């Protein structure tokens, strides 16, 4: 299954989760799109609940099914800790997500584009792989030639607040993951236990 690139507002309403991170999609119409609108919420089976939660998490990070599943498999091989939390940490440590958390992009989709286009450096070296796994303390910065890109500057200026687990220098356009986030600091609306149950049945 390929990565979803369609209208994020419609998908957000279907999933009941803001994929842009702004919440604007749900502010006016917090029900699924379509003719029947708010009356179209049906009771889901156990499998349906697990699938829906998996889709919410997958779409929120903008990953294709194969990439998402492979990351889950990697999480199962981590010794110690809770599987669901370990999986969430792998998602959070993706370079495109860290760029988004630092406020260098307004959405994860935009952050992925910035990485793909070579605008982002890791410890001074250009990295154009969105799935690159960021280590605590690594410096994420904007390439000098990209420092005047309007979309990047607009993103930085529009930031209201950043997570406590990152640091950022707006003058240098650089920041880092200062520590691994606690579970309650990332996607509190997601029940990752349902995602674990889904894949435990599938793998």
Curated annotation (Swiss-Prot):
Keyword Ribonucleoprotein listed: yes
Q: Which SMART domains match?
A: Ribosomal_S4, S4
The answer to keyword Transmembrane applying to this record is: no
- Do you know which NCBIfam families this protein is assigned to? PRK05327.1 (NF003717), rpsD_bact (TIGR01017)
Q: Which GO terms describe its cellular component?
A: small ribosomal subunit
**Keywords in UniProt for this one?**
Ribonucleoprotein, Ribosomal protein, RNA-binding, rRNA-binding
Q: Which GO terms describe its biological process?
A: ribosomal small subunit biogenesis; translation
Oligomer and partners: Part of the 30S ribosomal subunit. Contacts protein S5. The interaction surface between S4 and S5 is involved in control of translational fidelity.
Do you know which HAMAP family this protein is assigned to?
Ribosomal_uS4_B
Protein's job: One of the primary rRNA binding proteins, it binds directly to 16S rRNA where it nucleates assembly of the body of the 30S subunit. With S5 and S12 plays an important role in translational accuracy.
Q: What is this protein called?
A: Small ribosomal subunit protein uS4
State the Gene Ontology terms under molecular function. Answer: rRNA binding; structural constituent of ribosome
Domain S4 RNA-binding: where?
Answer: 93-156
Family, according to the entry, reads as follows:
Belongs to the universal ribosomal protein uS4 family.
Q: Which gene encodes it?
A: rpsD
């Amino acid at each position: 299954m390929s990565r979803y690139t369609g209208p994020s507002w419609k998908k957000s309403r279907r999933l009941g989760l803001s994929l842009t991170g702004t919440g604007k999609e749900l502010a006016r119409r917090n029900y699924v799109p379509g003719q029947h609108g708010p009356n179209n919420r049906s009771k889901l089976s156990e499998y349906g609940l697990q699938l829906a939660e998996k889709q919410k998490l997958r779409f929120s990070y903008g990953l294709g099914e194969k990439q998402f599943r492979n990351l889950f498999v990697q999480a199962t091989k981590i010794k110690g800790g809770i599987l669901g939390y370990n999986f969430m940490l792998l998602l959070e440590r993706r370079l495109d997500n860290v760029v988004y958390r630092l406020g260098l992009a307004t959405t994860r989709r935009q952050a992925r584009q910035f990485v793909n286009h070579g605008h982002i450096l890791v410890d001074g070296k250009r990295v154009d792989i969105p799935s690159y796994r960021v280590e605590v303390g690594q410096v994420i910065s904007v390439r000098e030639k990209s420092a005047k890109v309007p979309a990047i500057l607009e993103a930085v200026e529009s930031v209201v607040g950043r997570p406590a687990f990152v640091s950022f220098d707006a003058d240098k356009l650089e920041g880092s993951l200062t520590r691994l986030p606690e579970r309650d600091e990332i996607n509190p609306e997601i029940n990752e236990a349902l995602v674990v149950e889904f894949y435990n049945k599938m793998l």
